[in-house]
């Protein structure tokens, strides 16, 4: 079997993708690049008997003999690296998010179109058991056409913030606005229904206490109210509310389906409830189905992170490169359908809640309006179009907050404890288990 040669940019978040490549029958990792040398050393320890080349310098890495690049670098920097990789003739798997500005969005779309290469957006929440089964049911017409949906990605990252920002004041996580990181909530609904978001208004919490004490400048959570092209409505909630939750619900024209709420202890994102009539207007006896979906490659997918989503997003990416036109990847247009509602929700927030139309960059004429739009909250990118991180104005955070976070990160890393070390330990264990199941990954979907 031909194997796709893959390089991974970002040794920390990229660990799961690296393990997929090490274990897979359809791919192999040939290069890893990270500016943080300890990450490279950890992978050398985890994968001692492999022909992997390690790079600190991206310019050297991108010249390596490889077919594809996984972008697991900072979430605000994916578009420029994706464009560069495609110019070098590499297929691209992009972690979330696809771009930071509309200028980048236009350039990314045009780079993909020009390259004729595979661009896959790695929104792994789309491939978790419940939302992925919801996609299958929706496509077969189980609940009819979407009328309303709710989705939420709640992750109170305060306990691990020092580990994932290193105490750096200018780390992207401390400086993105509240609606930016929206595709873990919105993405699955877009992927399930294939309906394009056309209009949005946003709201953000003005409660910031928990964010300020960890050095983050945005509101604690945000809401996007999204209108779809068929007139359906989505309510998307995401951010740092106190207790974590991943949840998806869709009301269709003849029924409803939803994943389990986490506090029910019934399976969370692995459990699905379906209540649908045979036809709209039947109003017959309630027919509630409750079950844990079993997907293809279910056993091997359990080894990987995000409810198996890390497995399926990579598996389909590689299969698409190998020629499977039906491989369920998320292309650049769908990636922007997932991400632009967050960008334009913040424009709405800054405009006092005014609804905003969402551009469709499939339309070449529509691109011209946005070709030079650099508006974002990153001063290195925005130029004279800089947004505040928080609609109430950027808060002043004492330097001591970042010093405290940095010290805690260093202490844990040197003691081989904490979130980062646990992630690498999990990666090592994951890699061993994945290699034991490597033959499973060689199986093609029927």
Please report, for each region that a protein language model flagged, where it lies by residue:
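C-terminal glycine/acidic-rich active-site capping loop/insertion
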Residues: 124, 254-331, 370-436, 442-446
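Hydrophobic residues in well-ordered beta-strands that form the structural core
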Residues: 94, 119-121, 150, 259
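N-terminal Rossmann-like dinucleotide-binding module
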Residues: 1-48
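A contiguous, mid-protein "functional segment" used to position or interact
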Residues: 331-390
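Beta-loop-alpha module in the N-terminal Rossmann-like domain of NAD(P)-dependent dehydrogenases
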Residues: 38, 49-111
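Predominantly a Rossmann-like dinucleotide-binding segment in NAD(P)-dependent oxidoreductases
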Residues: 12, 118, 125-216
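Glycine-rich, aromatic-lined ligand/substrate-binding cores of catalytic
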Residues: 179-183, 187-277
